[in-house]
Amino acid sequence: MALPAGPAEAACALCQRAPREPVRADCGHRFCRACVVRFWAEEDGPFPCPECADDCWQRAVEPGRPPLSRRLLALEEAAAAPARDGPASEAALQLLCRADAGPLCAACRMAAGPEPPEWEPRWRKALRGKENKGSVEIMRKDLNDARDLHGQAESAAAVWKGHVMDRRKKALTDYKKLRAFFVEEEEHFLQEAEKEEGLPEDELADPTERFRSLLQAVSELEKKHRNLGLSMLLQ
């Protein structure tokens, strides 16, 4: 179905001059072949229309002759049929109704007022799908990293818990040894005191010497206790 040529179709939508080696999109916009090549020089695809971002466009076989792909023919036939929600457009349809799976043209969308939430351009839907896929990949990577960190934290906590339990057992053992030593020394000191009390009075003639010897014995006992405690703490 050929469309009449007019002033708007005779100019390239990018350079606004007469198109050289014309390329016509399914949506009706015309471009120079060189302009389109420069426009998409750094893109890998998809390649929507540079003017309206329609995601389906074809190149003309001959200058001035519109492309007649199967998809374009189907859309033009749908546009020529009576529309349910508004007048049909003469250009290729740009939108698809996701709720009813039926095509809707740009003219019908403009006549309907604000864009309803169930209508969405195909190129925008594809772009959103890529963004969602990238977000999911990032979230999956973050989740895996968090699991690895959690596992490392649990392992470190288990190791430190083992160290604390070992130190606690060692401290209890040292405390029991020190307490038993003090009890033994106390009994030994009491026995020595009882022996001293049972000596005859003539052997206690010099109380100063006896008191000095007792002080020396007490000092040696305290020194022995202090050295033993330090040695246990340093183990």
Curated annotation (Swiss-Prot):
Q: Where are the zinc fingers (RING-type)?
A: 12-53
The EC designation for this entry is 2.3.2.27
Give the primary localization class.
cytoplasm
Task: Report the enzyme's class at the first EC level.
Answer: transferase
Positions of transmembrane segments: none
Instruction: Name the pathway it acts in.
Output: Protein modification; protein ubiquitination
Q: How is it modified after translation?
A: Ubiquitinated; undergoes 'Lys-48'-linked autoubiquitination in the absence of growth factors and MAP3K1-induced 'Lys-63'-linked polyubiquitination. 'Lys-48'-autoubiquitination leads to degradation by the proteasome, while MAP3K1-induced 'Lys-63'-linked polyubiquitination results in the stabilization of the protein. 'Lys-48'- and 'Lys-63'-linked polyubiquitinations occur most probably on the same 3 C-terminal lysine residues (Lys-195, Lys-223 and Lys-224) and are thus mutually exclusive. Other sites of ubiquitination are not excluded. Arginine methylation by PRMT1 stabilizes RNF187 by facilitating K63-linked ubiquitin chain formation, and enables dimerization, c-Jun interaction and subsequent AP1 target gene expression.
Cite the record's note on assembly: Homodimer. Interacts with JUN, independently of JUN phosphorylation. Interacts (via C-terminus) with TRIM7.
Q: What is this protein called?
A: E3 ubiquitin-protein ligase RNF187
- Impact when changing K224R: No detectable effect on ubiquitination. Marked decrease in ubiquitination, but no effect on subcellular location
Q: Where in the cell is it found?
A: Cytoplasm; Nucleus
| GO biological process, alphabetically ordered | positive regulation of cell population proliferation; positive regulation of DNA-templated transcription; proteasome-mediated ubiquitin-dependent protein catabolic process; protein autoubiquitination; protein K48-linked ubiquitination
Q: Name the job this protein performs.
A: E3 ubiquitin-protein ligase that acts as a coactivator of JUN-mediated gene activation in response to growth factor signaling via the MAP3K1 pathway, independently from MAPK8.
Which InterPro entries did the record assign?
TRIM/RBCC, Znf_RING, Znf_RING/FYVE/PHD, Znf_RING_CS
